[in-house]
Amino acid sequence: LHMKLHSFPTRRSSDLVFCLPPSIQPDIHPENIPLDILYEDRDVIIINKPKGMVVHPAAGHYSGTLVNALMYHCGEDLSGINGIMRPGIVHRIDMNTTGSIIVCKNDKAHNCIAEQLKEHSITRKYHAICYGVIKDDEGTINKPIGRHPTDRKKMAVNEKNGKEAITHYKVLKRFQNYTYIECQLETGRTHQI
């Protein structure tokens, strides 16, 4: 086995020691945040998530998330499949996207909805306003999306390290410098739209 440490080759008799800091699991608390509930029954709750709200706690966003609001609204009645940081969450939408999100209240519903998303029997459509005038009335964008090569906070088309991202679009209306479109996603990559 040929290895390097800090660009220097290691010797066959060398020992490599890894010191990993303990992972810190932040405390996630219920918060009384108003929810725009589109539908609710004993298995699922469908929320119209507003722009600016993060779906689940993550680095830099441990409060004010949809999960914090759901914990307050639903109490213990959320699927535990995705753990304490994502109770009930089957899919996500970006922080700056407004749209419907299905949340599962039990593991049976979670497995059922996850399978439907995987099999594409649930259709996800979004409306978006794009800068520029799109010439074709409809089309498909099939480009891999991954981290931007120089700005890790951004996503970009990344042929080398990106994951498959397929978006079908249909032009609804054209304006002088913008196009209003409907998008149907086959995949669900961060910042895909």
Q: Where do the language-model regions lie?
A:
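Short histidine-centered loop motifs in beta-beta connectors
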Residues: Q176-Q184
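Short, surface-exposed charged micro-motifs
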Residues: D36, P144, H168-K170, E182
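Short beta-strand segments enriched for Tyr within beta-sheet-rich domains
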Residues: I113, T190-I193
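Short coil-to-beta-strand transition motifs
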Residues: D27-N32, N158-T167
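Short flexible coil/turn linkers enriched for glycine and charged/polar residues
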Residues: D41, M95-N96, I122, K163, ...
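Thr-Gly-centered strand-to-loop micro-motif
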Residues: H56-P57, C104, M155-V157, I181
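Short, exposed "boundary/linker" segments that immediately precede the start
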Residues: L1-H6
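RNA pseudouridine synthases
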Residues: S7, R11-P149
